[in-house]
Amino acid sequence: KRVLIIRMGSLLTALAILFSLFPIPVAAVEAGWIDQAQMPEDYTEDASTVTINSAEELAWLAKTVNAGTTFQGKTIELTSNIDLGGSQWVPIGTKSHPFQGTLDGNGAVISGMQVSSDSGGLAGFFGYVQDAEIYDLELSSAVLTAQQTGIQRAGLLAGWVVGSTVSGVTVRDSSMEVTISGAAQFSSFGG
């Protein structure tokens, strides 16, 4: 019996060493909503109105705008409340690819947004908005974190708004944490 116990112990030790040599995949934290983007079922390029009713469809809007489609002359209608909790939000629009359409929130609540920006970026639900309209929307339980070392613009609704109309937008139970380090060329932070 003693020899069997020693051999079993040696075998288990050898197996433990063997398994430690191979990486074991574990559940990863999701990179962000952009990776879960899903085009709305009723979307066509020539439609004047696009309806959004899920976090995945909202992520599709961000991905599509950030790739170069501005939605100028089109209306984006939110048809339900959307929970963005659990993944990082990628802002809609960049300086080179701004959102230029109309967002009609229809009173919808976007909750749980988590967005962060490292140096030199635009952070918010929208990154860059130009010649657009945004109205009738609520952001709730949103958290924005910005680490600022270069040009930085951050706001819970938008990082940068140019020549646009914003009305009927409410921000509730939300927070912004901004850390500035080093020399900043320009900083702008707001709601």
Where would I find each of the regions flagged by the language model?
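Sec-dependent N-terminal signal peptides
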Residues: 4-18
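C-terminal segment of classical bacterial N-terminal signal peptides
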Residues: 18-27
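Surface-exposed repetitive/solenoidal architectures
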Residues: 27-191
